Amino acid sequence: MLLSSAFVGSCLAILNFAAAVSAQGGLSRTTLNIVNKVISPDGYSRDSVLANGIHPGPLISGNKGDTFQINVNNQLHDNSMNTSTTVHWHGIDQHHTNWADGPAFVTQCPIVPEHSFLYNFTVPDQAGTFWYHSHESVQYCDGLRGPLVVYDPEDPHKDLYDVDDDTTIISLSDWYHSPAHELLPGPIPPNSTLINSLGRPDGSDLPVTIIEVDPTKRYRFRLISMACHPYFDFSIDGHNMTIIEADGSNTEPLSDIDQIRIYPAQRYSFVLEPNQTPGDYWIRAAPLQLGNTSNPDTTTSLGLAILRYTNRSGYAQAASVDPYDISQTPIPVNPLLEQNLHAYGDVPELDEECDDCKLTFDFAFNFTAVDFTVNGTSYVNPTVPVLLQILNGTYTAQELLPHHSVYTLPRNKTIEITMPGAVTGGPHPMHLHGHSFYVIQSMGSDTTNTVNPVLRDTVAVGGATGDNVVIRFRTDNPGPWIMHCHIDFHLALGFAVVLAEAPQDVAEYVSPIPTWDELCPIWDNAPSHN
């Protein structure tokens, strides 16, 4: 493939920029070749969409302050799934680099087959557990997802653990035996749950992931839900966990937790001390389906792995417990409650004189149209990305497309969003791009916390009538940021809005690279769109 002069010039500019910032931070370079490949993580062979031919995709890592340069090469050819692609770096704020955020038709046009795009962004003040995934239709459900970790050499919790590396990342994924678009409007229960790269469908005895621990060390595990649909009850038989991070933000250590309910796109770091009798212990991820908050699936799609002590004398401990026997499944005594997590730092106060700073998003499902709505409107991708519309001089919510799905926000204000419960198909994990937010009121809680609530980027909404979720954040990051349900099938059915933050300031704050300008003309001239 011939490289355009703009592409070459862009690469040289980026390399010069990277050299200029190297004194302040490092440079993390990665190439992701997006390919089709037949894999069988649960014993069933199917074609998939993968980064570098593996699932999950390769770990991308760096340190706080680093610049990340990630070249995405689209080598897809299987028309039974999406062949265009984008990649979103989930949880990264993207200050000054809204163009690199990734959601198709919000911040960019998709990358078509046989073309590449170089994402370039700096992470100056974030550290923690993130991930990356396709943000084109339901493509990430077909396998395009992987871990992204930003380490902090000055981590305030570093005295609590001894090991934190690629062996302590635990990913949870739902896996389907059919291409994701065939499951729409869906979703349907997954055929299996994968812990890292392996799963067992229908209660089989196929191999599972084994995670080894040395009883003389303490481990920081980074738990990532890469799911498209279910949420999970995660636990490790016989072991408690100390939570120290949620969605890339440190929390006050919360100890003695024996179960974590984790929703799609959420992440937690927990410290585990292997202080039990040496042996093997089941790691469990029991999926819960939509509308079912009390009965996890402990049989057909139960996710399993093994925590193995390196000084064990045998394998009897795990083998003697039937993981599918409910009578042998440990009952949680102290499960994690979101409202018990507390962040560091000050919660921003409301701007009482700001009429545009308090929003309510009413979610609903239209059974006739078979779509989701936010305040009565179902989101449909515009033909021109919202960022490009803004850079071309369109600033008002009345003018920006898609109509009635774009909300403009003033700059440097505190925004409070209320999301009532009782939503069909919930709970719904709502993710806001470009920001972390304080969860003033959590799902299922009748109390508010404006002192030290958890700071995160994905929060569950659902519950009963009258059950509100309230979040709060500062508008310090001009650009269009999509807010959507992270059940990917629901996003495909219109469960989203765009928050256009200080649109009149975007041109000064965001400067896309030349190859970004080429994406839409290439997309428009592609012979077909899939």
From Swiss-Prot:
Cu cation 2 binds at H90, H133, H486. Cu cation 4 binds at H428, C485, H490. Optimum pH is 2.5 or below with 2,2'-azino-bis(3-ethylbenzthiazoline-6-sulfonic acid) (ABTS) or 2,6-dimethoxy-phenol as substrate, and 3.5 with guaiacol as substrate. InterPro entries: Cu-oxidase-like_N, Cu-oxidase_2nd, Cu-oxidase_C, Cu-oxidase_fam, Cu_oxidase_CS, Cupredoxin. Its cofactor is Cu cation. GO terms for molecular function: copper ion binding; oxidoreductase activity, acting on diphenols and related substances as donors, oxygen as acceptor. GO terms for cellular component: extracellular region. Its EC number is 1.10.3.2. Glycans are attached at N82, N120, N191, N240, N292, N311, N366, N375, N392, N412. Disulfide bonds join C109-C520, C141-C228. Cu cation 3 binds at H135, H433, H484. Induction: Expressed during growth on spruce wood (at protein level). It catalyses: 4 hydroquinone + O2 = 4 benzosemiquinone + 2 H2O. Pfam families: Cu-oxidase, Cu-oxidase_2, Cu-oxidase_3. It is found in: Secreted. It is an enzyme of class 1 (oxidoreductase). PROSITE patterns: MULTICOPPER_OXIDASE1. Residues 36-154, 167-311, 379-504 form the Plastocyanin-like domain. CDD domains: CuRO_1_Tv-LCC_like (cd13856), CuRO_3_Tv-LCC_like (cd13903). It comes from the Eukaryota. Residues 1-23 form the signal peptide. Keywords: Copper, Disulfide bond, Glycoprotein, Metal-binding, Oxidoreductase, Repeat, Secreted, Signal. Inhibited by chloride ions. Inhibited by citrate. Inhibited by oxalate. Activated by acetate. Belongs to the multicopper oxidase family. This is Laccase-2. It comes from Fomitopsis schrenkii. The gene is LCC2.
